[in-house]
């Protein structure tokens, strides 16, 4: 008998708002929480899913939710499974830098993201990559960038034409993170 995967999904109106309904429906047992206002119960889950959105527009609230950020970092360090896409990946990084200042995030990934106006650059398109023998497909849409050099990827990412792109994919313990919004129904 197949084990039921208990999934906790970050969701709110903007910071973590980009969810394919088909992906949500594909998870067997789902609960939601708002990282801006709720401390998640991570004790009885098999997967934490941090989808995309616009965390850079709500940095004060995410910064003030320090207990939530700490709980997510501790969960990752204990080997908890996390899938983080775009805004979710940004949230797992060390910090997000804006024109107003630098905001510490979860600190699971040792990178900084810039959302400064001068650094804005559109990254857009369909993406695919193979990791651990599985093919992942999705799309990329963001204006934020890594501060400094783009960190190394654990696999090569390709666009719809099969051409390599510089979008990195990260694996840390049981964390999978990328700017790519994954269509997990196929994966």
Positions of the model-derived regions?
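N-terminal beta1-alpha1 cap of cysteine-dependent amidohydrolase-like domains
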Residues: 1-64, 74, 113-119, 145-150, ...
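Cysteine-nucleophile active-site neighborhood
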Residues: 55-128
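General beta-strand structural signal in soluble alpha/beta enzymes
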Residues: 31-33, 84-85, 178
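Short gly/pro-enriched beta-turn/loop segments at secondary-structure junctions
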Residues: 3-6, 42-44, 76-78, 84-85, ...
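Generic recognition of flexible, low-complexity loop/linker segments
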Residues: 36-38, 71-72, 92, 165-167
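Amide-donor transfer/coupling interface in amidating biosynthetic enzymes
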Residues: 1-5, 113-187
